[in-house]
Amino acid sequence: MEKKLTYYISGYKVELISDFPERLEKMLYGFSPFVVQPKTDNQSPALSPLIMQFVINESQNPSNINFPKTEGEMVHTFAIEEGECSMRKSGNKYNFTILQNGDGRLPLVLDMEIGSSLVNCTCGPANLLNPDNLKFALWIAFGFVAIPRQTVALHSSVIIYNNRAILFLGESGTGKSTHTKLWLEHISGSRLLNDDSPVVKIEFDEANQLVPFVYGSPWSGKGRCHINERYPVASFVRLQQYPANKITKLSKLEAFGALYPSCPPAFLKDDYFEGQICEIISNIIMTTPIYRLQCLPDNLAAELVKVTVFE
């Protein structure tokens, strides 16, 4: 008998429907803080609308799982740690597949349609399902329904200071986590919201102006910092390793180029979703300062950002 798990992610209601809710709940480490509405800096947002029903169809015979038709347009292929991924589309209908690493190559297939909250997930036996692959599939599905609603996950590490957020951007290995650790060690009152994939959402502030807010999410990489809270964004800072500490406020064109690479690559490969993401970025750079920090991995770099953004 199908049962439902309900979560609240970035102010939206998400339902997971399956025949194995107890097992599913144990697999989804990081999701438990999201069974309630997010804590906010001041007033709670309006009642969370339902944007996704993720229905898991467990197949005891993985060979019976239908793969996407070959005539569908290939959007993107890429590898993750535990599998190989592909996304195809035909009109408004999209199909996302993960082939799990190892013997048997167990598939996980998502069927989605623009404008629909229903996501059908077909997978092999639950006891053989890789939890990391399931979490990644949920991340893809959430992006699919959230991006058209001015909401996107950004590859970044987020510090909260004085009830506002700074998102540190950069390619993997640039030193985002290293820099945020320097904040935690040397700047009193700072704390980490998320260390890999926070969710940025364009919302109206108290002055009725559209501005970015950031939410913690169930997806936080190896740091596993899963905090269900929401804060206004003070700034975005793109990191660059450098033999000295220097911070520069970017022009709107430079700011666009700083934010774009931190958006989900699978969606940037698709014309429709790229357009939606570009609209989100445009709304961000109209109201929010974006900086480039060229820096050493030292506490003076963190202090430089604090003084620039907050003082």
Question: Where in the sequence are the language-model features?
Answer:
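Conserved glycine(s) of the Walker
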Residues: 175
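A noncatalytic interaction/capping subdomain that flanks phosphate/NTP-handling catalytic cores
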Residues: 1-167, 171-172, 182-191, 199-311
